[in-house]
């Protein structure tokens, strides 16, 4: 998607989320805007568009590699995150390494990393993976994450959901209009 196309779509969604956009009596539902860190290509555009429309969003943060060659939770992004905090947005975990929870087996969960390697995580390791962005975000902004998390790729397992809940994080999935290849993949539980 081109930057121009992305900007137009983002502006439309942000406009719908503003107080003026939802003040219509016929519209009784709430629209929640959420963004995952990704490669941060559109980070500034997202921030500008949200500010222009006075819209708030929830950002799910992971320490992902950015187009600049650093990571989204490196100190080089501190000013960006501090500004979003000052604007009143909400923040949740998108896991530290942005891996994919693949399958539960006995008391372990298979976790595939971005480089293709697979690890097995117990409940404590699952919690550590979800909590680690909170520690870094606090270092960068002085603010803790909200007790929310979103599984990378929308992939959860029964064990990851249970472990995350036990360590205080509520899972927030994607809407059916997310960017997954098929509707069936949305919040798919593997295992």
Regions found by a protein language model. Give the residues of each.
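Basic- and aromatic-lined ligand-binding clefts that recognize polyanionic substrates
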Residues: 140-164
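Bacterial N-terminal signal peptides
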Residues: 11-21
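Bacterial N-terminal signal peptides that target proteins for export
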Residues: 1-11
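Charged, glycine/proline-rich intrinsically disordered loops and linkers
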Residues: 102-121, 187-191
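Active-site beta->alpha N-cap acidic-glycine motif
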Residues: 24-105, 114, 129-147
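A substrate-binding/cap region within the structured catalytic cores of diverse enzymes
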Residues: 119-126, 159, 163
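His/Asp/Glu-enriched short active-site or ligand-binding loop at hydrolase and phosphoryl-transfer sites
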Residues: 155, 160-191
